[in-house]
């Protein structure tokens, strides 16, 4: 019997050792694959940079190694990498032009505009851009239209339909499950809560949405009209007529494209542009590899920190196994900004913000950290597709603010959506509750679960929101050098397009991320400088450990995006409903711009 237990123990130890060895070998294989994928050939002369863009474009993204290994990756593209590659290709003599291929792009119009402006700047160097698509989405065509030549498949199409917003309302759906909502808010334009309490747009919401989507469309019309030499009236007529279903041949006569070719034939077009013969090989470099193949002579001088803030503003990180949405975690951001303030090597900071806001308390704490940072060194805010409500709040520390004409900003207001699940719990599911308490409001924490919200609780929450709005308004007045009366006229939760925001002094100037970096250098009196990105991105090992601990939902989130399509955003909205802090300084609704 003793020998039996020895053999069992030896077997267990052997199996454990074998498993450990296989795990180590697996990690070595992964490291090898990552290392081999990072090994890029030297750039050859007479080269073309290939840009194939499809998927979701964000300001900055982590490399998703798990998706790459499984081959089931939903493309998340970093705008910072796109802009860097275009700039480097412009300054590299070996790169003669760009081949641009666009598919379905999921991003905001300000991001598209920033990339488009970078491509236009690339052309100013005398280099060319050739764009191609089997079928071009509206966003894809907006990018492609800046090219010298645009080609489409002979049986392809161009989707050009204008812009629409279709908010979703869940009041009746929620009521079927015994769920109701009570709203406390300040601001007639603060219409986020309409999603839960109404079945259509309010007049105020319709007014602001009409204003800014009309402004977005005018920007697109102007840019495409100038690049393609097509009148705005013609472009509007094409959008009205469901051009995506028209005969493809009409695209050339309408000057939307320059020609037609199949995918294999576009190579011949590029060869001709490079002066190559039919049997010559094209020297090409993928835009993702440019950082490793082109030396950047601009990486010298004093350091300007570019700190990225993307996603919802929260007090503490709220991880999920199936949602990879980025978050602006106030505790982490404050710590990072304090470190940048104390870092003598950092001479200025660019705060890159792309957020619809979030927790009001967290926004106030970040506001103070930014203000304290600005006392030690210049801070410039660079607004992406949106920097609204809480994201605008945190920008009010007296610093210079830059945005795009198509940025959505403002939304100075606060709301609270108080969900009431008591009918679901007691009438639908049959839960029973009883209580013993020492004071009148001892059970306030269970309001909306065991019982409806009381009139006293609702009134107290409304007073709380009123104080928060007053503080928000005062922060804006102080930061923008305005009176509270002036702020009130442009507040009330209203969302403003960048073009209007500059007129009413919510921002200081127009420009993209590179312009903001240049402005920070100017304010810091720097003649030579380099931009360094913060916070540091997680490596593959950190991503693995996070996923093992249930702290990242990147992979499962990608599967949800692919499976749900247009239903993804409503699903996430409903799932997050109960997790949010009750008082929010957030964009007045979930954006749904088509």
Model-derived features: where do they sit?
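Intrinsic disorder and flexible/low-complexity segments
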Residues: 301-304, 308-344, 464, 535-594
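Non-catalytic accessory/assembly modules
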Residues: 17-20, 25, 38-43, 68-70, ...
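Short glycine/threonine-rich loop-to-helix capping motif typified by GTGT followed
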Residues: 360-365, 500-503, 543-548
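Active-site proximal loops enriched in glycine and acidic residues that flank catalytic Cys/His/Asp
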Residues: 308-311, 353-355, 383-385, 405-407, ...
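Charged, glycine-interspersed solvent-exposed loop segments at helix/strand-loop junctions
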Residues: 167, 171-270, 422-504, 508, ...
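Cleft-lining beta-strand/loop regions that shape enzyme active-site pockets
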Residues: 40, 47-167, 297-424, 466
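Hydrophobic alpha-helical transmembrane signal-anchor segments
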Residues: 3-39, 46
């Amino acid at each position: 019997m003793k020998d039996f237990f020895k053999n069992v123990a030896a077997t267990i130890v052997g199996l454990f050792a074998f498993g450990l060895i296989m795990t180590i070998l697996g990690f070595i294989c992964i490291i090898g694959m990552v290392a081999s994928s990072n090994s890029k050939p030297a750039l050859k002369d007479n080269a073309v940079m290939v840009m194939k863009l499809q998927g979701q474009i964000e300001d900055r993204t982590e490399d998703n190694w798990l998706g790459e290994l499984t081959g089931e990756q939903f493309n998340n593209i970093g705008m910072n990498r796109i802009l860097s590659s275009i700039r480097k290709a412009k300054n590299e003599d070996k790169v003669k032009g760009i081949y641009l291929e666009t598919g379905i792009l999921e991003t905001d119009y300000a991001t598209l505009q920033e990339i488009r402006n970078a491509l236009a700047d690339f052309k100013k160097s005398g280099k060319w851009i050739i764009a191609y698509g089997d079928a071009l989405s509206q966003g894809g065509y907006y990018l492609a239209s800046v090219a010298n030549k645009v080609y489409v498949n002979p049986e392809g199409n161009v989707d050009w339909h204008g812009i629409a917003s279709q908010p979703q309302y869940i009041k009746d759906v929620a009521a079927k499950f015994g769920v109701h909502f009570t709203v406390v808010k300040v601001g007639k334009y603060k219409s986020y809560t309409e999603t839960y309490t109404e079945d259509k747009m309010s007049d105020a919401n319709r007014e602001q949405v009409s204003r800014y989507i009309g402004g977005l469309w005018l920007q697109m019309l102007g840019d495409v009209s100038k690049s393609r030499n097509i009148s705005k009236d013609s472009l509007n007529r094409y959008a009205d007529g469901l051009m995506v279903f028209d005969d493809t041949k009409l695209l050339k006569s309408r000057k939307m494209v320059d020609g037609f070719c199949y995918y294999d034939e576009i190579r011949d077009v590029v060869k001709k542009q490079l002066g190559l013969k039919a049997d010559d090989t094209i020297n090409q470099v993928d835009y993702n590899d440019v950082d490793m193949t082109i030396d950047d002579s601009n990486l010298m001088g004093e350091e300007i920190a570019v700190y990225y803030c993307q996603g919802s503003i929260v007090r503490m990180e709220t991880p999920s196994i199936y949602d990879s949405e980025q978050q602006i975690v106030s505790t982490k951001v404050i710590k990072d900004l304090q470190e940048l303030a104390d870092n003598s090597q950092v001479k200025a900071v660019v705060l890159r913000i792309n957020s619809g806001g979030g927790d009001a308390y967290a926004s106030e704490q970040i506001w103070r950290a930014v203000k304290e940072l600005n006392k030690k060194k210049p801070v410039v805010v660079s607004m992406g597709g949106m920097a609204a409500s809480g994201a605008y709040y945190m920008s009010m520390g007296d610093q210079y603010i830059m945005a795009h004409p198509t940025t959505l900003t403002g939304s100075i207001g606060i709301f609270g959506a108080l969900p009431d699940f008591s009918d679901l719990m007691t009438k639908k599911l049959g839960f029973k509750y009883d209580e013993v308490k020492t004071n009148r409001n001892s059970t306030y924490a269970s309001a909306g679960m065991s019982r409806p919200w009381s009139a006293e609780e609702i009134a107290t929450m409304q007073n709380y929101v009123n104080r928060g709005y007053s503080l928000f308004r005062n922060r804006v007045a102080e930061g923008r050098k305005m009176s509270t009366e002036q702020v009130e006229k442009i507040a009330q939760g209203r969302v403003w397009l960048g073009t209007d925001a500059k007129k009413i002094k919510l921002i200081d100037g127009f420009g993209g991320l590179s312009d903001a970096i240049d402005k920070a250098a100017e304010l810091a009196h720097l003649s030579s400088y380099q931009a360094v990105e913060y916070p540091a991105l997680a490596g593959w090992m950190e991503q693995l450990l996070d996923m093992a601990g249930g702290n990242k939902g990147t992979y499962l989130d990608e599967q949800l995006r692919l499976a749900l399509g247009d239903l993804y955003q409503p699903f996430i909205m409903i799932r997050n409903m109960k997790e949010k802090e009750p008082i929010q300084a957030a964009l007045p609704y979930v954006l749904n711009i088509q």
